[in-house]
């Protein structure tokens, strides 16, 4: 009788686990990468002067190398695009339907540029997406230049104080003339939209 009760309890627990996993997998906000023990303590990926995670200027622009370099944390999709008049290979690292990291490579077949949009990936200096301009710079002069973000917002790109290989793209509200950098007083509340590493 006790054996029947144990089997019945085990069967109930198994069915419960299957339903729970099926429910999680079906929800759009769920990511299988969250089940990885590495995700329990935050991202192990870091941005440095050398690259992002294990990816650097010597990493081949192929799926296996990039997946390994990003700890298998994302779903990858690839394609080609024209950037500054050159045809480049692009890998997009996705979490569900959100772009988290974009990697670009030129004709030599190596990674040449990485754009990080994932708030969980910090630089080795503690900088991350969402940080305000005022946390890193007191003024734009000498470090920043005007640009336009992918989202067509007003934007500036500022070279990291720690490395010329790392830049921060800041976006924010400004109604001034196109082509000019906003005043430092306006910029102080702009936030990092993406962190860029270049070879």
Predicted regions and their residues:
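Bacterial N-terminal signal peptides that target proteins for export
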Residues: 2-13
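Low-complexity, intrinsically disordered short peptide segments enriched in small/polar/basic residues
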Residues: 12-15, 163, 189
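Short helix/turn-capping signatures at newly exposed starts of structured segments
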Residues: 25-152, 159, 179-199
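Broad, structure-driven detector of short, well-ordered beta-strand segments within folded domains
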Residues: 99-105, 164-172
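Surface-exposed, gly/pro-biased binding rims or lids
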Residues: 167-183
